[in-house]
Structure formats: structure tokens, C-alpha cells
Amino acid sequence: MAFTAQQQLRAAELRQLLNRAAHAYYVLDAPEFEDAVYDRLYRELLDLEQQHPDLLSADSPTQRVGGPPAEGFSSVEHRIGMLSLDNAFNAEELQAWDARLGRQLEDNPERQREYVCELKIDGNALALSYADGVLVRAATRGDGSRGEEITANVRTIQAVPLRLQLKQPPAWVEVRGEAFIPDDTFEAINAERQQRGEALFANPRNACAGTLRQLDPKAVAARRLDFFAYTVHLPADEMGPKSQWDALQWLETAGFRVNPHRERTSGADGVVAFYDRWEEQRHQLPYATDGVVVKLDALERQQLAGFTQKAPRWAIALKYAAEEAPSRLLRLVAQVGRTGVVTPVAEFEAVPLAGTSVSRATLHNADRLEELDLHSGDTIVVRKAGEIIPEVLRVLPELRPEGAEQLELPSHCPECGSLLVRESGEAATRCVNSSCPAILRGALRHWVSRQAMDVDGLGGKLIEQLVDRGLVRSIADLYRLDAALLASLERMGEQSASNLIEALAASRQRPWHRLLYALGIHHIGSVNAKTLAAAFPSWEALQSASEEALNELYGIGPEISQSMQQWCSTEANQSLMAELAALELPLASDDSSAESAGAIGALTGQTLVLTGTLPNLSRLEAQALIEAAGGKVTGSVSKKTNYVVAGSEAGSKLQKAEKLGVAVIDEAELKALLS
């Protein structure tokens, strides 16, 4: 049945009224309507939508209650990477970061940098995408590059606006923030679970993460999650905030709940004063916090400071002091990693810390083990560094039992029996047997991981079976497995085996840069692997690359280039690459692949250097555009450089370009080249 114009107008009016009322209640804490009035208006809209389904819209408050259960979550790529933050754990580390940032910005030593301090909410990061003001996608952080699409679940969070409260919303905008569960809600959830005989959540963060991954949005709605927004990303051509402080005000204007406990301050001392105040008062808040997030205020200076591979240089998390607890040491275990490093791990009687039960902690290396002077049966003090990673802080020797033996790392590998080696000047003790089962298991786990070759269905337990039974002795052996053999293994059947064979076959189509990362070469992360693959589009090209050529690449220094050359020159690694080539794995870039690290385009064969701050593009965005057009971005200017792209406050690279006669262009000229 068609709806009338009057019904259409009434539905729009009801949506506007109800969304405004929800914002006033959940965000401003200033209710506009009595509950009975809200319920009557809500019922009227619901009846209209049920009678005329075509009136239903994505921003309707009736969509918050959740639709039918989902079959699963799809993986989505973040338009802008969701990086993590570096941490500081005391005032000295914060001051060192502030000084380092000043040097990177080439500030006068006396200059006090302007910072915005915000409470670090202990929840789960979300990215919310709005098209023409309407929420169209919500995703988890995931690995920073890709997350899970959980839009239906996030629509149930009342503090998340389904439509932005802006008269002229941008065509696209992404808002980031933290979903969390308030303390009283968390206690109520656990009380209900206890009554039903279900396992209790360890802490609100875990409860929030588990809730967001519920397949039934109605179950999510029942948990009453909350949300604070803290970042906005607008298109480059959109006039937006010029500072983090203004960005927070923009978010409030757009209808988001922003944490009120924030402060703009000058210098590290102001940051420390804010931190000290909230470390003392944090338990008075109705939700969990685990520190203070500090951001350089001016967005232009943020761009100038730039990013490392994992985190922005212009922001840091100053974490609260960790909780401590005494425990009794039970045993020392030597754990062998995928690179052969043997790590001492302390196992002790379980103690509650920061909302979870802790019974193991890494001791990192033999030096730390010797420094602690651990003996069997010792009483130790355990804490969680950053309230995440358990560590043994100290030993209480006065409580040591009589006759206790000093604990040391074994002289031989606990996995293969080979003599362990510790090179002069190195902290790490290693097993150097390339056939060690522990090294192989670690290498296989890394190879099949999502950011690497992404082989679905090949988990840790199955890898253990394959290695322990001698069915897989190298990465290459994975591609020699057959379905009949796999089906005979524990917890495997014909269908699971068939699915795994298909997943392995699909992994042969991964681009060259993914394979390069999957090899697990020391210092070669996913970002460096892309850089290397773009510059050297095949194994042969990379193998023959000189150290000088490697060092010219943006983000590649001597440590990385030496590690790469050492790996390439090792006979066992050369044999592995020959096997992978014979098995038709991607040892070269495929320009037809959407994920190809390189591309043929307007800048193919051209070398560019970026310097200064561009008016619209961040350095990472500019680099991505250049590489997508087939160009190469390096970190230094030479006679081989084709263009230097200069923004405001360009430094010595601009001077060197002028001296060498290298063409200097601005952002507009770069875009013209790209087109």
C-alpha cells in the first residue's frame, strides 16, 4: 500500500523528534520528553514503518533495536589506517617524548608545544563512516588495516547518532571513538550471567569486545553499550577543524558524545599535572580508564610530525601505574619463538590483576633472568605493564625457601636439543637449528596469518599436528599436502580438508608484498614489505639489490637493509624461494592484481621525495597516491630523484634539490602529474 505525502512528512518529523530526544537524553544528559511521550512517538513511527516499509530509513531510531541475527562478520578495509599509540609510563618518559617531538618539528628548544589531554577510555576502538550525514558503516579496529563490519550492532548504541546533526553534512566523514560498558552496566551483566550459570566477564573491556561480536543485534542492544568520539577524518577538500580541540567541538556539534574531562595545555608539565589529577580521581568515574591520551593540538603540526610504521609521532598514551600483586613462582619455562629466540617465561600461582587472572609472564632474556636472581619457589611481585602485559617486577628474597636453587636458561634447546647460542653483544639466546620444530611452528603460524598469506582453517593446533608428525618440514611443504592426508588428522574431516586445500590454493594469488612479509624476515613488517616490493618487483630484483639501493627507500634504514641482505644471501632461504617458485607462489608483482604493491601509471619509473607539510594530503596519503601511479618515494634527494614535492616548512631536502637541479613541485603540480 502506497503512503501519502502527509505520512511521509510525519515519518520524517517523528525521526527528527526521536533522534533529537535520544541525543538530549544519552549525550547531553538533559531529557526533553517524559518517557511516556517518547514511547508514544516511537510507537507511532514504528506503526507507520510497519504499514509502509518504504518509509524505513537508515537513520530511523527503530533500527537501533537490531535486526535478525547475522551469519557472520565481513572483513572491511579501513580507508585510513587505524594505528595504535606509543606508550609512556611515567613523567620522565613523557618528557623524553615531548623533547623528541620538538626535535622532529625543529622547534626552538624554549618552545612549549600545545597539547590536548583526553582520558583514555578502556574500551574498544570503532570507525564510523557517514555518507551525506547518515551512518553507513561501523567497523572494529582489527589489525589496523582491516576490521570487522559491525554496523547493525553499532546502530544499537544510543550515543552513536544515526544521522549527523549538521545542516550541511559532508559527503563523507569518518568518526573514531571508543565503545565501552559503564561500570554499573557491567556489574548488572555479570550478575545476570551468574544467575544463568554462565562464565563471568573478566572486565568491562572484554565484555564490550564480546558484545560487539555478537551475531544478534538484539543481544547487543540489551547490553547498553556507550560511546565517546575522539577523532574526525574529513575529505581533503572539506573545510574542517584546524586543531584537535576544534575537532572535539565539531564532534559535539555533529551530535556525538565527547568525554568532558579534557584540557588544552602547554608543555609536558601541564600534561603531567592533568595526568596526576586523573590518576588520583579515576576511580570516581562511572567507567574504566587506563591513562591519558596526549595529542599535539594543531593538525598542521601533526602532519609535519608524521607517523612511524605503527603509531603517530604526535600522540602518546600516558598510562596509569600498574597494579601489583605477590605470587609464588612455580616453574621457569624456556619458550622458543619463530626466529629461534629462547625466552624465559615464569609460571606462578594465579593472581587477579587489572580485571583478569594472571599466571604467566615473560622475563624477556637471560640478562633479565640474572638480574632478578630467581630461585625455585621464590615469592615474586607481579604487575601488568600498561594494564595489559604481565611482568615480574621483583623478587622478595627474604621469603625465599631454604635450599632453593637458582634458575637459569638451559644450555640446549628444549624443543630439538641443539646447543643454544648467544652472540657477543646480544641480549637474545637463540636456537640456530633451522629444522627446530618450534621455529618451524612459529614460521608457519606467521605465514598463514591474516596480514600475510591469510590461509583460513590452518590454526595452531593443526600446525602442531603437521609438524609433530613430520608431514610439514618447511613452508613449501604446506603446498604439497593433499586432502586425503589432511582428512585423516585429528579434528579434521573430508570437508575441512577440502576447504583447507582450497584456502592454500587461494593463497597462491596473494601479491608479492604479502609473501615477502609472510617470510618473517627480521625487521620486515607489512609496511616495509610493501615499500620493498614496490621498489623491487620480483625476488630476483630484491636478491640482487645493493645496500645503497635499499637505503634509498623511504622508511628503510641500515638495520633493515642489512637484515634483508643477510636473509637473501643465506643458502637455506635461497632454496626455500626456489621451492616456492616451483610451486607457483607469487615471487613477483602482478600488475593486474588489485593488491599489487606496484602499478603502471603516470609516475612509473619516477622517483620522488616528500618534504614539508602539504596543504591537503598527509605524507602517507601522498606516498600512497605516488605508489599507486607506479612511482617510488625515497627518503633522500640524489641526482636520481625526478621530483621533490615540497610543502610548507620544507627543510634541507628542498635546499639539496635546488643545489642538484632537481625539479621541485607543490601538491597541485603533483596532482596534475597523477592525472
Swiss-Prot record:
Database matches in SMART domains: BRCT (SM00292), HhH1 (SM00278), LIGANc (SM00532)
User: What's in the GO CC field?
Assistant: cytosol
Would I find Cell membrane among this entry's keywords? no
Residues of the signal sequence? Answer: none
Q: Where is the BRCT domain?
A: 598-675
Q: What is its EC number?
A: 6.5.1.2
Q: Which InterPro entries match?
A: BRCT_dom, BRCT_dom_sf, DisA/LigA_HHH, DNA_ligase, DNAligase_adenylation, DNAligase_N, Hlx-hairpin-Hlx_DNA-bd_motif, NA-bd_OB-fold
Q: Biological process GO annotation list?
A: DNA repair; DNA replication
GO MF annotation, one: DNA binding
| Cofactor(s) this protein cannot do without | Mg(2+); Mn(2+)
Record key words, sorted:
DNA damage, DNA repair, DNA replication, Ligase, Magnesium, Manganese, Metal-binding, NAD, Zinc
- Listed binding positions for Zn(2+) are 413, 416, 431, 436
> Which residues bind NAD(+) per the record?
35-39, 84-85, 118, 141, 178, 295, 319
Record carries keyword Transcription:
no
Q: Where along the chain is the active site annotated?
A: 120
Q: Which reaction does it catalyse?
A: NAD(+) + (deoxyribonucleotide)n-3'-hydroxyl + 5'-phospho-(deoxyribonucleotide)m = (deoxyribonucleotide)n+m + AMP + beta-nicotinamide D-nucleotide
| Family, similarity comment | Belongs to the NAD-dependent DNA ligase family. LigA subfamily.
Q: What does this protein do?
A: DNA ligase that catalyzes the formation of phosphodiester linkages between 5'-phosphoryl and 3'-hydroxyl groups in double-stranded DNA using NAD as a coenzyme and as the energy source for the reaction. It is essential for DNA replication and repair of damaged DNA.
Q: Which NCBIfam families match?
A: dnlj (TIGR00575), PRK07956.1 (NF005932)
Q: What is this protein called?
A: DNA ligase
Organism encoding this protein: Synechococcus sp. (strain RCC307)
